[in-house]
Amino acid sequence: MKLETKAQGLRGSLRIPGDKSISHRSIMFGSLAKGVTTVRDILRGEDVLSTMQVFRDLGVTIEDDGDVVRIHGVGFDGLKAPQNKLDMGNSGTSIRLISGVLAGQDFDVEMFGDDSLSKRPMDRVTIPLRQMGVEVSGQTDRDLPPLKMHGSKSLKPIYYELPVASAQVKSALIFAALQADGESVIIEKEKTRNHTEDMIQQFGGQLQVEGKEIRISGGQTFTAQEVVVPGDISSAAFWLVAGLVVPNSKIVLKNVGINETRTGIIDVIKNMGGKIKLSDIDQVAKSATITVETSELNGTEIGGDIIPRLIDELPIITLLATQAQGKTVIRDAEELKVKETDRIQVVADALNAMGADIVPTEDGMIITGKTPLHGAEVNTFGDHRIGMMTAIAALLVQDGEVDLQRAEAINTSYPSFFSDLEGLLHG
């Protein structure tokens, strides 16, 4: 796919598609609650559609009229053994969290995914689930998908210190703990996104969170709710960076989720000197309007406890750093290696091919800016965030063409990305 280059400016306002993390969890909690849950502004990207189909395969009736999704919840006890293998597509969120849901189910399941998902290690979930009494096996000693699993109606509670900062692993263990006999304690390495904890309380459940320690009792039931999904800050991130680095730009993003565990990119932009403003802040919905405009930027250091708050935004932050004066150092981000691709290597290769100066490290990157970018051929390797990062980078290219291979990966999280880009180019 040939990408748009030589942008003269991006102007206009956008309403960002629904948050992917919250969309997944809305389907899960709606399915596990009693009654009919309605979800508005859900993201209809491929990952979320995978989760929706899996719960249908587990016996849940889910209606989608294109406006509102209605989930006829069955509770933990109402899930049925699937007739076929469960297809998780490209979605690490789906396979990890649903492993936790199925941990307390006394039936056989097999979960599989696409080529990319089949390379992602699941041992960080399977090891603690085995301790709780689940029979589960995968491929190689890292338990790559497909996973075969048989849950237990007498799950043991667990005391578990997470070896990595991972909201997916934490959430999988929370779903399992909700079905265990007694109280479980989960201790995070670093604070990660807390949508699962928030939604437990929204759906009438209980848990205690003190610092990095989560206590949760089994045997809880949930009640159906009305959910409105805010815009996804991980999708908004591409426009935040575009508005900062493309000359003559001003972009207004409406209804963006600003959950405090997800706003690391806003902190980084401020640290780099970017012009960014939040308005219309809704403390209940945790959303705001965010405005950015073309800025002179300086390099910065990114590491430590901010990393889980921007882990998915690091590819586009790397592009931002190529357009800042001086060095930017990203560290403590080894988790990038086990995303849809090895994002440290793939991001560096893609942007270096376009003229950037990026040195990959064991746990991050060293980026030296400011560098002009030129045309190149870039492959997403099936990673949606690489695709969108490259499309924004292409806007800065003055010399040559940018040819993006496997651009369809973007549909994983942002099916309307290119139409939104067109709107801003002609805004």
From Swiss-Prot:
Q: Which gene encodes it?
A: aroA
Which family is it part of? Answer: Belongs to the EPSP synthase family.
Specify the protein name: 3-phosphoshikimate 1-carboxyvinyltransferase
Q: What is its EC number?
A: 2.5.1.19
Cited InterPro entries: Enolpyruvate_Tfrase_dom, Enolpyruvate_Tfrase_sf, EPSP_synthase, EPSP_synthase_CS, RNA3'P_cycl/enolpyr_Trfase_a/b
Give the keywords, sorted.
Answer: Amino-acid biosynthesis, Aromatic amino acid biosynthesis, Cytoplasm, Transferase
Kindly give the HAMAP family that the UniProt entry links to this protein.
EPSP_synth
Subcellular locations according to the entry: Cytoplasm
Has the keyword Cytoplasm been applied to this entry?
Answer: yes
Please list the residues that make up the active site. 312 (proton acceptor)
Annotated positions binding 3-phosphoshikimate: 20-21, 25, 166, 168, 312, 339
State a single Gene Ontology molecular function: 3-phosphoshikimate 1-carboxyvinyltransferase activity
- Please give the function described in this protein's UniProt entry: Catalyzes the transfer of the enolpyruvyl moiety of phosphoenolpyruvate (PEP) to the 5-hydroxyl of shikimate-3-phosphate (S3P) to produce enolpyruvyl shikimate-3-phosphate and inorganic phosphate.
Its UniProt pathway annotation is: Metabolic intermediate biosynthesis; chorismate biosynthesis; chorismate from D-erythrose 4-phosphate and phosphoenolpyruvate: step 6/7
Q: What class of enzyme is it?
A: transferase
Where do the annotations place phosphoenolpyruvate binding? Answer: 20, 92, 120, 168, 343, 385
